[in-house]
């Protein structure tokens, strides 16, 4: 594979609508194989390097189990244990690591790190999470919606809470997949427009009142108020976000059959009440499991392209 043919997955916008239609279809197929205990090893003897600067439960488990279920192997690499954590240039690490493995997943702080890594990699690189974007999680959310309600095109998604990596990824997804995003963030925590494409403006709307943002929504979603790396702001954020807790009253403004999602970990009583996240509209456990299935489809697609089936 030459450098020109390598595809990376660093932001949601890296794939086209047609790519997503294929990957979502493959996700459903791979999930059915998993549920039926079918052996399927298209990535036999392929190796995934997992580089973690930010710790994780769901990201590590889903990628490590996923590559194993596809017949491959995973190598866990922490910046505490590698030269990346000792000051080796990202570009040099990318050159070395990509000569020894078939695909790389990175979970780190700055998007610039993963961008530079991909620019110097001989193999596909996947964004497992950065401060700016979280494409694998939103892809899992989209598939979860599809499972429960069908295509998300033309639907309305409400985002309540912090303007974080999830929200910026939802904005990109709205533009590509053709749904409307209604969002509400507290004063002082508005969108950083440097991370938002002007072309996406028709696909999202900003509301001061989170209840207003939820009106007519088919899906209501949120995240923690304090993301990893912002712990020093925790107390200030708790005060600022107090009215942005998704509770039963707020869900009442959404459509009666609206779903609730949260990428986890959740803090009951902060960004969401127990009554909502543990209630009948919540699909958070399906959402968490689907990280496994969408990432298997993603790795298969990046390494093998479109399969004839």
Swiss-Prot record:
This protein's name: Ornithine carbamoyltransferase
Cellular-component GO terms for this entry: cytoplasm
Coiled-coil regions listed in the entry: none
Family under the similarity heading: Belongs to the aspartate/ornithine carbamoyltransferase superfamily. OTCase family.
EC number: 2.1.3.3
Protein origin, superkingdom: Bacteria
Function of the protein: Reversibly catalyzes the transfer of the carbamoyl group from carbamoyl phosphate (CP) to the N(epsilon) atom of ornithine (ORN) to produce L-citrulline.
Positions that bind L-ornithine: 165, 223, 227-228
Source organism of this protein record: Burkholderia cenocepacia (strain HI2424)
Pathway as given in its UniProt record: Amino-acid biosynthesis; L-arginine biosynthesis; L-arginine from L-ornithine and carbamoyl phosphate: step 1/3
UniProt cross-references to HAMAP family, sorted A to Z: OTCase
